[in-house]
Amino acid sequence: MNERVAELLQKKEKYTFTDLCTIMEILRGEGGCPWDREQTHASIRNNFIEETYEVIEAIDTEDPKLLREELGDVLLQVVFHARMEEEIGRFDIDDVANDICAKLIHRHPHIFSDVKADNTDQVLANWEAIKADEKARVTVSDKLNAIPSILPALMRAEKVGKKSGLDSADYAANPEEAIATLMMLTTQMAEADDAKRGQLYGEMLFAAVTLGRKLGLEAETALTAETDRRIADYMQMEQELGADPQKALTPEQLAAKWQTLREAYGE
């Protein structure tokens, strides 16, 4: 890479996406950064996962400054991986942009063609039909196998339940059925061996995910919010006691203190 280009980049007041690609080319090129040059898709795989979660956290905390920063980190990962592929001649970042542009145009025929879609449900139905046609997935099994196994378990369960129909119980209309199912599984777990207990616990979690989906709730979002509330509760108890609640209280006192705190919140 021309040293003059590197010098000019340092003097810019505002950078563009093209500049990001150029910087990555410099870092990966001859005489570039030793660390960047050594990386492979596999070696920075976890970085991509971590950066993605940090974007989600920025969204959840409604912090636009942090969101801007974290989106940049994710964009860096995209450019990094695309640059590796360009170096071996398989594709480059323009190919990536081309493919997603073509996909968006093809999957929005109600915008770029004459297909009618008067509401969100019709748009989503068209999207899934076009997606299935593109991927040549003609069976439900194909669609289920196409759901990435690396997804968070609760999110994956939602997708499998929605596509398979194996969670057809209408817990939203009959919440007592959900309660009965969970109680039955709890009873069976108490009597089962370790191997069976794990299976029953999985069924219980899937039933809980189904209940949420039927009510229009996302399991990941709901569990994250509840976990955050419990952290906040513990911090408040620690502040009120001036000590670690687990050391200052017996398990029974800790449970009672937490219940009192929840009741004060109207929970």
Task: Set out the residue ranges of the language-model regions.
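Flexible "arm" and connector segments at domain edges
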Residues: 1-70, 76-267
